[in-house]
């Protein structure tokens, strides 16, 4: 069966997350509904996805895939039709054919997120639903010093929702993490790992901000990792500032082509 990967961008404020849910608007259901209309004579399988994002979380470059009974002859026509039929807040940016063994979730070797932070005393019209407003003073140098402690293969049990990890392995490898200062008021933390647990990025960034605020004198990322206890880490930030940026596939170079968005 032919196998196709889609590159999808979406505004999470419009949806109850990625995963299909009965009687609720989700990204998966909106794309599958559109595919069902477009490919009614060539039915598509259920979508697989690189990351099942929660309600309110956005995506700039999500990868998903589906299979059909017969080849799709015209990719341009498919993209135009998908974007006409999906609701406001979802854009399908590109499509490529991939090998039959490609699976958006299980073939993925790395995932990258950013968390956007607005750092100011005063409100901005562009923050609500798009970023987290940091109102108090932050020692950004102190935050930077903690970042590299997170890099590597570690047990991140302190940085995930406790109930979701009962009896599960909590070891993940953070491949890269950095603080990016885009302007005096705008920062973002970019984090890439081989996989993430529930709320892991939101708790990690919340903890880094608590450290930057000087909330703890004796607690550091090192000590929080050692504790393996969710109560030792910082707050879970809201989903507003979280964006899925990219999925990586070491064994599937065709995905590099997927991220080359066609220009007019």
Curated annotation (Swiss-Prot):
Keywords: Isomerase, tRNA processing
Entry keyword annotation includes Isomerase: yes
NCBIfam families recorded: hisT_truA
Catalytic-site annotation from UniProt: 54
Keyword Lyase assigned: no
Lineage, broadest ranks: Bacteria, Pseudomonadati, Spirochaetota, Spirochaetia, Leptospirales
Function text: Formation of pseudouridine at positions 38, 39 and 40 in the anticodon stem and loop of transfer RNAs.
Catalytic activity, as annotated: uridine(38/39/40) in tRNA = pseudouridine(38/39/40) in tRNA
Residues reported in the UniProt entry to bind substrate: 113
CDD domains reported for this sequence: PseudoU_synth_EcTruA
Subunit comment: Homodimer.
Sequence similarity: Belongs to the tRNA pseudouridine synthase TruA family.
Top-level taxon of the source organism: Bacteria
Protein name: tRNA pseudouridine synthase A
Catalytic activity, EC: 5.4.99.12
Stretches that traverse the bilayer: none
Organism: Leptospira biflexa serovar Patoc (strain Patoc 1 / ATCC 23582 / Paris)
Pfam family, one: PseudoU_synth_1
Name of the top EC class for this enzyme: isomerase
Gene Ontology biological process terms in this record: tRNA pseudouridine synthesis
GO terms of molecular function: RNA binding; tRNA pseudouridine(38-40) synthase activity
